[in-house]
Amino acid sequence: MEQDRRRYTRVPECLQIAYEILPSETIKEYLTKDISQGGIRFLTHEFIPKDSSLKIRIIFPKTLFSFGALVRCMWIKEVPYSEEFEVGVEFMDLPPEIIDYLIGYIRHSLNTGELK
């Protein structure tokens, strides 16, 4: 059986994100596929090189909470039979209050099966 290498538990969640690949100022909007304390996975129509730095904003509509963060592209892969790419990014230097929010959000999602 394959062991999961992830440090953090992911929860499936469709959240709106806006991102820009630095140093570009072109903002694109997409939806997440899942989120963890360590990062997010989302789909996009553009190739994002591995190790690229991005600036993102994530919106949690049910709680009216949002935050911006710097992230690093850890991996990217083509989605078969599609013109999309699946991207995994890691949060860089999140403030403690954002980490606390994510931990509570994920814990609530896992305990209730309900996503905020």
Please report, for each region that a protein language model flagged, where it lies by residue.
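N-terminal helix initiation/capping motif
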Residues: 1-37, 104-116
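Short, surface-exposed secondary-structure edge patches
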Residues: 8, 43-47
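Short conserved beta-strand and strand-loop elements enriched in small hydrophobics
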Residues: 16-20, 52-66
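Conserved positions in beta-strands of structured domains
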Residues: 20, 33, 72-74, 92
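Short, solvent-exposed secondary-structure boundary/capping segments
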Residues: 41-44, 79-90
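Short solvent-exposed strand/turn elements
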Residues: 84-102
